[in-house]
Amino acid sequence: MPLELVVDKTSRRVLGLQGFGPMGDGVLARINAAAGLIARGATIEDFSTLELAYAPPFSTALDALNAAANVADNLLAGRLRYVSIEDFLAWMEEPSKAPEWMALDVRHPKEVQPFLDKYGDRWLGIPYDKVRERYRELPADKQLIIICDACTRSYEVQSFLDSVGVTNTLGLGGGFNVIRRLGVDWWPR
């Protein structure tokens, strides 16, 4: 479930939360939990360290609220640079709007292949677990939009690439999980 925190950059106070998901009850539960914290002036750190009940077979120890706070922290610290879903969708509809962009898809090759077939030179596929050995193949003259399902692997790839001096990267905020739910026309069939 994609969640987005609205935060004050200076005080790091959380001002709001929005999100969506296939079943609204999960989103509603997070918004209800967040509402109480926001009313008390909670900061990013309060959300990041929030303890919520979970059952391992059904959810993760790191809740979506924690993850959203960690993303906000990484954005404010400059450790994460991203392109919005809206800007990415505009580029997919009209590539001439950002001819310097190229998608770097780090998902499994079976997921990537239809995009390589359809979009050719606008799309590059390097599996997440191969980026460390293949990063020298990346074009230096392109703004690389790193794509995965939820932006988690994109962030990790971006962090690694930063460490080796490749900084012409942006992660796709929300990842393909969000785009898949939007039902876009350009998705390969």
Model-derived segments and spans:
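Flexible, glycine-rich terminal cap/loop adjacent to redox cofactors
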Residues: M1-G78
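Rhodanese-like catalytic fold shared by cysteine-dependent sulfurtransferases
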Residues: E45-P56, T60-L62, N66-W101, P109-I145, ...
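Active-site flanking residues adjacent to catalytic metal/cofactor-binding acidic residues
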Residues: L104
